[in-house]
Structure formats: C-alpha cells, structure tokens
Swiss-Prot record:
Coiled-coil segments: none
Gene field: pdxH
Pathway(s) it belongs to: Cofactor metabolism; pyridoxal 5'-phosphate salvage; pyridoxal 5'-phosphate from pyridoxamine 5'-phosphate: step 1/1; Cofactor metabolism; pyridoxal 5'-phosphate salvage; pyridoxal 5'-phosphate from pyridoxine 5'-phosphate: step 1/1
Catalysed transformations (reactions): pyridoxamine 5'-phosphate + O2 + H2O = pyridoxal 5'-phosphate + H2O2 + NH4(+); pyridoxine 5'-phosphate + O2 = pyridoxal 5'-phosphate + H2O2
The protein's role, per its UniProt record: Catalyzes the oxidation of either pyridoxine 5'-phosphate (PNP) or pyridoxamine 5'-phosphate (PMP) into pyridoxal 5'-phosphate (PLP).
Name of the molecule in the record: Pyridoxine/pyridoxamine 5'-phosphate oxidase
Binding annotation for FMN: 60-65, 75-76, 82, 104, 139-140, 184, 194
Length: 212
C-alpha cells in the first residue's frame, strides 16, 4: 500500500517560547486541560516505551492517573513484561499524542515503583469490576481462551460478592521522574515547533528550541 500522499495539513498558529511556562509540569497541565476541553478521547492515554536487558524496545498504551511536580504515575501488574523490563532497566519514555490539537508531549526519565500506600489508595478508588480484573489477569502470560478469563472473573466476583476485594501485592503504580520533557506543536509546511525542557543538576529546567 502506497501512503506517500496520505498527509495532514497543519493549521495552528505555532508555538513561541514566550507562550511557555518556565515550569514544564505547569505547561503540561495547561495542555492537558486543553485536551480535556477539546473532548479528546482519553487524553490521559500515552504510549510507554521500555527496554529490558535484551535491548529490544517494547511499547504499549497505558493511562496516566496522577501527575504533579514529582512525576507521572500509571498502574499495572508488577509481573508484566513492562514491569520486568523496568526492573532490568529503570528508564522509560512516554508519548502523549494529542493529534486533534496538532500536539504531542514526549517525556523521558527514570522510573520506579510508588509506595504500597499510594497504590492501595488508588486501588480502593477503582470500580469493583476493575479491582477484580487486577486479580484475574496474569498480564502478558499466554492463555487458552477468553472464556477462561471470564470464568475466573465470575469465580472471584462470587467470592467477594458481599465484601471488599483485597489489594493484590503484585499490582501497583510506577512513577516516571522526568529529566526531559518535549512539547511539539504542528506547523505549516512541516515547520513544526519543538521545545525541550531539560532538568539541570541544580534542579532548574532549561528550555531549548529544537529543529523540527
């Protein structure tokens, strides 16, 4: 299939450094709120890239659940492929593709587990079905059929029908602690605007314009 003529024409006015907040987390919050206001589908969905000791990169979509100036938090099974890769190489990259706004945000940094207390707090906020789902799915393992998953779901649902679903020790959150955050805005004639925030040793952030 020849896709050489499949292209979009960017129409936004562009982005200037004077438009940016000096704090990348505040800039992210501004863009994130604008993505919500634009009614984008799951604006908190992002692609997470990790690399294990075999040096083969892996990428998948996960959901951002918390962010502040400490970092960006998502939740997963601690026995999953991504968790094993993070254990072997605690570095990650994330990409938020807000394409309807002609924007994307790329984040790179260190990654680590959050505390059990923080993970428990979020687990208790989830719908009961999602809590059960965390117990049912041995993430990334081969299964024989979907019906097996559904059977296990029903078994656990019946087991805890009159009580709380216990917190699984193999499930919890990770936080990406960024060292680089790049904001990309589409521009006419492919003259896109890219600004890179980099964390310095003194804790301050520098801002540089990058060629598109």
């Amino acid at each position: 299939m020849d896709l050489t003529n499949l292209r979009a024409k960017y129409t936004t006015r562009g982005l200037d450094i004077k438009d940016l907040d000096q704090n990348p987390f505040k800039q992210f919050e501004t863009w994130f709120n604008e993505a919500i206001e634009a009614k984008l589908t799951e604006p908190n969905a992002f692609s997470l890239a990790t690399v294990g000791k075999d040096m083969m990169p892996s990428i998948r979509t996960v959901l951002l659940k918390i962010f502040d100036e400490k970092g960006f938090v998502f939740f997963t099974n601690y026995k999953s492929t991504k968790a094993n890769q993070i254990k072997e190489n605690p570095k990650a990259a994330a990409l938020f593709p807000w394409l309807d706004l002609e924007r994307q945000v790329k984040i790179e940094g260190d990654i680590q587990k959050i505390s059990t207390t923080e993970s428990l707090k979020y687990f208790l906020s989830r719908p009961k079905g999602s809590q059960i789902g965390a117990w049912v799915s041995h993430q990334s393992q081969v299964i024989s059929s979907r019906s097996l998953l559904e059977q296990k779901f029903d078994e656990i649902k019946n087991k805890f029908v009159n009580g709380e679903v216990p917190f699984p020790s193999f499930w919890g959150g990770y936080i990406i602690k960024p060292t680089k955050i790049e904001f990309w805005q589409g521009g006419q004639d492919r003259l896109h605007d890219r600004f890179l925030y980099e964390l310095k040793e003194n804790g301050a952030w520098s801002i540089s314009r990058l060629a598109p």
